Amino acid sequence: MSFELLATDGKARRGRLTFPRGVVETPAFMPVGTYGTVKGMLPRDIEATGAQMILGNTFHLWLRPGTEVIKGHGDLHDFMQWKGPILTDSGGFQVFSLGAMRKIKEEGVTFASPVDGAKVFMGPEESMQVQRDLGSDVVMIFDECTPYPADEDVARVSMELSLRWAKRSKVAHGENTAALFGIVQGGMHENLRKRSLEGLDEIGFDGLAIGGLSVGEPKHEMIKVLDYLPGLMPADKPRYLMGVGKPEDLVEGVRRGVDMFDCVMPTRNARNGHLFIDTGVLKIRNAFHRHDNTPLDPTCDCYTCKNFSRAYLHHLDKCGEMLGSMLNTIHNLRHYQLLMAGLREAIQQGTLAAFVDAFYAKRGLPTPPLG
């Protein structure tokens, strides 16, 4: 993987990631394909939304169907028929999400499989091997996602464990030609975040991610971290904000120098009838859409908006038809990709401030200040 910085506008960056499997223009949003599929989407439909790269879930794919099944097809790209780059998370966040079902030790994490209840162990070495077997283009280190809230002592212990696991991840990654990203932890504590970043810089990674956000903290706490952390990261490496978020969160991350994002929000919200449009969120199951013959979003060029009315989408939602979720997902993912394309163009042209002002004005909101 190579990263080229093409333009800046304030803290915001316009870049390009180049992989053997394709080019990713940044800032970029990656749809989440947890089980080897972006829910409700054919690979050609994902590509048609403008997505250049997707995310796969190491933890879930390891448990089911297992890497032997996937390797029987070649790798995850062959298994799911996605030809572009794939980033895989390490499994750390999913293990964190198991709560009382898991035990964390220096070696790694032992937990009861959510698939069949069997006792399972995963550590840095296992995570690196699974991601190698998946044929990931970007591999994430195995880390512990610091919970929220966490006082400084708890966050320090967690961050230091993640740094030790980062070293083991780097060793286990070995001669794998895929990119390896470190993950900055430390909770909401600036001194710990800075120490985590210093430790990761000493180990050496191809890119760096910001972990431990969007885990229940108030938005102002997340913004506080983003006000200082991306600017401390190496300028010649991509910066990835994990698991975030709403369109507003993407805009605020880009304004502060983040290059890559992923989140289940556009796909999950689509299945619940919450559709993103320029003015905010449209709830398609509301009764007043029953007789609305207008397109979902007249400014959107997706298949859904070009072909179907709000009344039809409302009908599908009320009937529980799977086509409704599919059409909603096509639109939400296209909306996110159009937003990212607009941000890239604005940075390139040096007009990001005007773009951001217009983005918020359409929502009837003031532009938040930059910290």
Curated annotation (Swiss-Prot):
Homodimer. Within each dimer, one monomer is responsible for RNA recognition and catalysis, while the other monomer binds to the replacement base PreQ1. Catalyzes the base-exchange of a guanine (G) residue with the queuine precursor 7-aminomethyl-7-deazaguanine (PreQ1) at position 34 (anticodon wobble position) in tRNAs with GU(N) anticodons (tRNA-Asp, -Asn, -His and -Tyr). Catalysis occurs through a double-displacement mechanism. The nucleophile active site attacks the C1' of nucleotide 34 to detach the guanine base from the RNA, forming a covalent enzyme-RNA intermediate. The proton acceptor active site deprotonates the incoming PreQ1, allowing a nucleophilic attack on the C1' of the ribose to form the product. One of its GO terms (cellular component) is cytosol. Gene3D superfamilies: Queuine tRNA-ribosyltransferase-like. Its cofactor is Zn(2+). This is Queuine tRNA-ribosyltransferase. Keywords: Glycosyltransferase, Metal-binding, Queuosine biosynthesis, Transferase, tRNA processing, Zinc. Belongs to the queuine tRNA-ribosyltransferase family. GO terms for molecular function: metal ion binding; tRNA-guanosine(34) queuine transglycosylase activity. InterPro entries: ArchSynthase1/Queuine_TRR (IPR050076), TGT (IPR004803), TGT-like_sf (IPR036511), tRNA_ribo_trans-like (IPR002616). Binds 1 zinc ion per subunit. Disulfide bonds: none annotated. It catalyses: 7-aminomethyl-7-carbaguanine + guanosine(34) in tRNA = 7-aminomethyl-7-carbaguanosine(34) in tRNA + guanine. Pfam families: TGT (PF01702). The active site is at D89 (proton acceptor), D262 (nucleophile). HAMAP family: Q_tRNA_Tgt. Zn(2+) binds at C300, C302, C305, H331. Residues 243-249, 267-271 are annotated as: RNA binding. It is an enzyme of class 2 (transferase). The gene is tgt. Substrate binds at D89, S90, G91, G92, F93, D143, Q185, G212. One of its GO terms (biological process) is tRNA wobble guanine modification. Pathway: tRNA modification; tRNA-queuosine biosynthesis. Its EC number is 2.4.2.29. Coiled coil: none annotated. The lineage of its organism: Bacteria, Pseudomonadati, Pseudomonadota, Gammaproteobacteria, Pseudomonadales.
